[in-house]
Amino acid sequence: MSSAALMEEIRNAQRAEGPATILAIGTATPANCVIQADYPDFYFRITNSEHKTELKEKFQRMCDKSMIKKRYMHLTEDLLKENPKMCEYMAPSLDARQDMVVVEIRKLGKEAAVKAIKEWGQPKSKITHLVFCTTSGVDMPGADYQLTKLLGLRPSVKRLMMYQQGCFPGGTVLRLAKDLAENNRGARVLVVCSEITAVTFRGPSDTHLDSLVGQALFGDGAAALIVGADPDTAIERPLFELVSAAQTILPDSDGAIDGHLREVGLTFHLLKDVPGLISKNIEKSLIEAFKPIGINDWNSIFWIAHPGGPAILDQVEHKLAPGRRANSRATRHILSEYGNMSSACVLFILDEMRKKSARRREATTGDGLEWGVLFGFGPGLTVETVVLHSVPAITA
């Protein structure tokens, strides 16, 4: 056998035969639940800003329009009283924030991962790869290492750590997991997105309303998936197939969403026209993603879109599926019940989609539809587009 033929044989033996599939999903939140209607009073009181009455009224309107009913946060009143610098707008406080998040990110991630592994039903020794994503808590060794230890995974697990990405990488982790599963025969990839807002919490400022927007929207949560190709259907139950995945930077979007880690924590900066930039460009991503499948009716697919805020959802819907709010029902439900959990959000929506489909006795895991799309939006502006194929309910 020639060297070329031998190499081809080796490469073929290393690759899976079928597409990557999502085999299990687990989610977790902190115990502390924040009711959105009560949050403006709490926020301005705990930050000693009650004298800023006009600003509080603006914040109240932001919260009222957010479509959020409640959020979950690690930060409690007691924790904030113990760390008063975090309640100021721009006080040096990074050490206190880091001390919290490096511990809580991995703990919350573990909670979600344990649930996913339990649903999967297989020994954790079968996990071959770990992808961990978080916006905060940069540390060495990273949260991927810490989670490997917490879960008792094999030391030879191949790890990938993603820090400081923002809101879009719920799609990125699926893209990476797909590549890992399809190019490593027998691979089982544990994917974890864990987000804690302690690094971004700060008091209000009259001159930086974009920071206030984040205080009205963000919540804490973690989601975990098991991804693998060629599932053994005698012991594994596929939920969705990962058909394709793409990433793009939107034109003319420099500075639309920025985040900067400083002594004061992580600061966010938003342009007003983020919803417009996304809605203006989103159809191009859809056309490119679904052209190989021959689909151009966006009402015929199920939707999982990162809920950066109600304005983004409204404008994307108006652009692609006017009058069809049903397309984003699961997305709006998660926004309402949890707020914007950054990278974890779309994975929560994925979980809600399959559970809602089962409750309603739909024909597939995708709200009764065969094909779907998952969008991640975030700094850049970066858009992740993942094409999903649902699974018949009889095997889900």
Swiss-Prot record:
Pathway: Secondary metabolite biosynthesis; flavonoid biosynthesis. The active site is at C167. It catalyses: (E)-4-coumaroyl-CoA + 3 malonyl-CoA + 3 H(+) = 2',4,4',6'-tetrahydroxychalcone + 3 CO2 + 4 CoA. PROSITE patterns: CHALCONE_SYNTH. GO terms for biological process: flavonoid biosynthetic process; polyketide biosynthetic process. The keyword Disulfide bond does not apply. Keywords: Acyltransferase, Flavonoid biosynthesis, Transferase. The primary product of this enzyme is 4,2',4',6'-tetrahydroxychalcone (also termed naringenin-chalcone or chalcone) which can under specific conditions spontaneously isomerize into naringenin. This is Chalcone synthase. The lineage of its organism: Eukaryota, Viridiplantae, Streptophyta, Embryophyta, Tracheophyta. The gene is CHS.
